[in-house]
Amino acid sequence: MRLSGDLPTFQKSFFRNLVAALVACCVLIKEKNFRLQKGSLPALLLRSVAGTVGIVCNFYAIDHLAVADASILNKLAPFFSIVFSALLLKERASWKDWLLVVIAFSGALFVIKPTFSLSESFPALMGALGGLGAGLAYTCVHYLGGKGERTAMIVFFFSAFSCLSMLPFTIIYFTPMSLPQLAFLLLAGASASVAQFSVTKAYSFAPAKDISVYDYSQVLFSAIWGLAFFTELPDIWSFIGYAVIIGAAIVKFLLSKTKHEKDVGTDELK
């Protein structure tokens, strides 16, 4: 998305979701089933609205803030997801879960090193709203997964909704694109498609408190791509952050594994 240059936020959002909508549509056509699960429409609409607002706010923040600042604000999403899951889905997170998320967030701070200034208050607010929207969207996805809604339908409904809502603004504020810009936007859309299917599948099968820590692995991949495409070599603070994030993820994995083995043992005794 950064390589696509200075294009309107709505235009970037439209192309970002267009590819995902087409891919999900092809999957549904192959399955020959466009039917929604009973009672899933309200959650699909809420997921789509929250996700669309989250994307627009995040892209606005990226365009008006330092990329590092926009990234750290988007990393608020797991916090919001755990809060929404507790409020809306009545999921309980232990103090260990909360502590690990805070530790992972601290690791992200080491990597991103945000530097806010007073003049950037509105874009920063938009970035925080982007994290809130993403967190609510993840919560809705987990709820829909519990109702048996298919991943392809969730991705298609959201992507189509986002494209349709962005289309009028894209037409009004359309900026001509060069072939490289169009190629980068389509490539971003393809990458987003893979990410959407993966994240939707993950949040469909597990609660936010079990997934949120792993969301910070994105920081590691961002560093890899930054080095590959922009020759951005991480400093010592970044490496400290990587160690904190990976450590939190490993501890979370071990805790989840221990809990699962304990639950299985309890079931066998019954």
Where are these regions (language model features)?
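Juxtamembrane C-cap of transmembrane helices in multi-pass membrane transport proteins
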Residues: 1-7, 56-67, 73, 137-148, ...
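Hydrophobic transmembrane alpha-helices of multi-pass small-molecule transport proteins
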Residues: 96-113, 237-256
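Transmembrane alpha-helical segments that form core, pore/gating elements
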Residues: 2-5, 9, 24, 116-177, ...
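C-terminal transmembrane-helix exit sites in multi-pass transporters
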Residues: 60, 77-99, 220-239
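Hydrophobic/small/kink-forming positions within alpha-helical transmembrane segments
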Residues: 25, 48-56, 78-83, 108-109, ...
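Juxtamembrane helix-entry segments on the extracytoplasmic side of multipass membrane proteins
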Residues: 14, 36-40, 113-132, 171-187, ...
